[in-house]
């Protein structure tokens, strides 16, 4: 009897130990789909949109056509009288557009446990914003700020319609201070899944960036759910990080030195990730962003759980004299 009991116990322990292995072999867990962002489309300038097969007019015809078009345009403009109502309509249109963009955004709440000087444990909450960038078939992937969530024990996200879900850190990058969070699709009801909108990554390789209208979403003013409208004022700025130089868009949007979020163009595409790195002491109250084209591959790798590998090279600007002496 004793031997039977011993053999029974051994069989039980063996079964409990091997059961997960056998289950995985018989019913392998479905792997998430690889996240691959579409290739960027080259920016097309207006002159490139002309039909190639159209007959080429003579120089005289072209000049007369341009003069006629200019006169017609000027006549139309002369007949338009703008007043404060038009100004209000413009801002109403921008606000309505921003409400559409807000459907891509989520509020991220990070809860961490800390101890005070009496060794009493208390919880601390931090809030930030993220943007839904992909769906790998099993998870919704959210790009957000790393600083807020890096030490959090619990992470919750609130979608635009109020639905809340637990999130996990999928991958982070120290250099750009970005984190990709994952939310299991099993935690979202089927009827609510249709309400979750996924943003599209655009391009920051503009032929002429300055003057491009943009909308800042997230918390660009340092206030949860704030927004800003404006344009790209300059793109000739470079932010040097380890193994990379990133294009910086300087905007004319007043914000906060701690502001975070994303820049959208008027086609609903992300063109930049707002950064707290400042290219000049005088720019601390102006929103700037890293161009999305430089971050596209990094975000794709993080969305697939891949680590960012760095050689450790940091570039600096040198004078012409120093360069010639090298």
Question: Which role does the model predict for each range below?
Answer:
Residues 14, 103-108, 130, 140, ...:
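Terminal peptide-recognition signature
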Residues 117-123, 172-176, 187-192, 235-250, ...:
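Gly/Ser-enriched beta-turn/beta-hairpin loop segments
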Residues 151-169, 174, 209-213, 225-238, ...:
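Beta-strand/loop subdomains of soluble extracytoplasmic proteins
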Residues 200-224:
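Short glycine/Trp-rich loop-beta-loop segment that forms part of the substrate-binding cleft
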Residues 3, 7, 17-135, 142, ...:
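N-terminal activation segment of mature serine protease catalytic domains
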Residues 186-200, 227-288:
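Active-site region of chymotrypsin-like
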Residues 21, 25-28, 135-177, 183-186:
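Catalytic-histidine neighborhood of serine endopeptidases
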Residues 270-326:
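C-terminal cap/linker of serine protease catalytic domains
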